[in-house]
Amino acid sequence: FYERKEIKDMMAYLQVVNNPADEIRLRRIINQPKRSIGDKTLAVATEIAQGIGETLFEVISHADEFEALKRTSPKLLNFAQIIQELMKAAEDETVSLADLYELILEKTSYIEYLKTEYEDAPRLISD
């Protein structure tokens, strides 16, 4: 069960919401579902982050401030905004883990992604 891609993706989302500096999991989810943020863009953002001593998430959150990321900054900023909204929800003591999970599915359009990518989406969604 835990080896399935969609489970790993959701676990990675929860972990990034808890710790946005988790670059490994951030890289896993930045294009899940697809957001057209390429490896080259991530490499440039990583290089910037290392150069200025910030996390990859911080650079993504301020992508419009970096000339090398201007072209893809709307996509990066959109992703960062989703994560920031989820982080804010996670800090709210009235939001349960189940609520946060549902919010991740909603904000990321992950259910729609599963429906378009997998024939057995109804089974995946019910799990």
Feature annotation, model-predicted:
Residues 4, 11-127:
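Conserved helicase C-terminal RecA-like lobe
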